[in-house]
Amino acid sequence: MSNVVVMGAQWGDEGKGKIVDLLTRESDVIVRFQGGNNAGHTVLVGEKQYILHLIPSGILHEGKKCLIGNGVVLDPEVFCREIDSLRAQGVDMSPARLMISRKTHLIMPYHKVLDQAREAHKCKDAKIGTTGRGIGPCYEDKSARIGVRAADLAMPELLRSKIEAALVEKNALFTGLYGQQPLDADAVFEEVMAHGAKLVPYLADVSSEIHDAWAEGRSVLFEGAQGTHLDIDHGTYPFVTSSNTVSGNAAAGSGVPPTKLDRIIAIVKAYTTRVGAGPFPTELDDATGEYLQQKGHEFGATTGRKRRCGWLDAVVLRESVRLNGPTDIALTKLDVLSGLKEISICTAYIYRGEQVAYPPQEQNGMAHVTPVYETIPGWDDDITGCTTWESLPAPVKAYVLRIEEITGVRISLVSVGPERDQTIRR
């Protein structure tokens, strides 16, 4: 039995969906433990592409149980739409194999209105590039102890009272600060309950489900969303998400003790990407950056926004290792680098006149660093057909081993293409 946490080591979009899909074969239960539908996992199965925003990608594997933990914020409308879409494609979406924690907080219609109004109201330099999905405002209400939880859907009077109380404050903001029309409490209640009727059968005690699985000797895979450097505490604040994306939150966001987590896999893209605003020291605003963007199909699964591209940043990776304690690394999109004569790796920053090995912790400090690069030979070979470590060209292996050396973490999986079987185990 193995309990594995999969988390992103950069700014998200590292290719977690494919790796989770691969590891799901070896797991019995898959748990999503944080974030909301601001993240998207793209999974390619044969000729069919699935984009999942809330439901764990393990749902595509027959016989696997998928759980949504208390650390997630869930939009009932999006959840119901995702269920309908997957069911239409022949996926079993019964409550016996998909469950939501009763403690999971719900993204309400007023959260989305507030998120979008707040971002639109900011001056250009203050915008953080939110997806406008209501994630942040939902987490705000959770911390303020005024949020709506999934269990409230089964208690209509409690739900109605929470909505009415929330709109006293939210409508004051909408009308007084943002010039928006107020929301009607009855209309919000009816909208939420319409989706809630479909959602209630999926409610469960997720913590107990996981512990029961362990008691039966089954293995659990904890599926993270986004990436370490979008973490609310440890990321490039304020250009971050509203939850903890580091491996430690797998326990808190699922209702299990951290001593049960025995393997942590950090997903690392072979180059670096970022969506939206925020510092990006190794960003390439040139032909090489465009090459990576086009060849890597770097468009956000959730927003469709073009991802910014740059060289691999080992400073960021060192910090990720320090924060997450990974047992091993899965390196993705290595095939995208084929065709480049030289490849650069950022091994340090110059910050305030000194060379540093870790990111500065001051707000906006990352915007004022100069990357220090080392350059190694690239390769022209098409590696998408390679199936073993030995079959990879020497320059490819040298690049992988250099990343391993810099991070001090073994690279156990190397992805050389989007398909499930285009993955090399070491």
Swiss-Prot record:
Matches recorded under Gene3D superfamilies? Adenylosuccinate Synthetase, subunit A, domain 1 (3.40.440.10), Adenylosuccinate Synthetase, subunit A, domain 2 (1.10.300.10), Adenylosuccinate Synthetase, subunit A, domain 3 (3.90.170.10)
EC category = ligase
Q: What keywords does the record list, in alphabetical order?
A: Cytoplasm, GTP-binding, Ligase, Magnesium, Metal-binding, Nucleotide-binding, Purine biosynthesis
GO cellular component terms given for this protein? cytoplasm
Residue sites binding substrate per the record: A301, T302, T303, G304, R305, K306, R307
Q: What residues bind GTP, as annotated? A: 12-18, 40-42, 307, 333-335, 415-417
Which residues take part in binding IMP? D13, E14, G15, K16, N38, A39, G40, H41, T131, R145, Q226, T241, R305
Q: Name the predominant localization.
A: cytoplasm
Q: State one Pfam family annotation.
A: Adenylsucc_synt
Catalysed reaction per UniProt? IMP + L-aspartate + GTP = N(6)-(1,2-dicarboxyethyl)-AMP + GDP + phosphate + 2 H(+)
Does Metal-binding count among this protein's keywords? yes
One GO MF term, please? Answer: adenylosuccinate synthase activity
According to its UniProt entry, what is the function of this protein? Plays an important role in the de novo pathway of purine nucleotide biosynthesis. Catalyzes the first committed step in the biosynthesis of AMP from IMP.
What binding partners and quaternary form does the record give?
Homodimer.
What's this protein's name? Adenylosuccinate synthetase
Q: Which organism is it from?
A: Nitratidesulfovibrio vulgaris (strain ATCC 29579 / DSM 644 / CCUG 34227 / NCIMB 8303 / VKM B-1760 / Hildenborough)
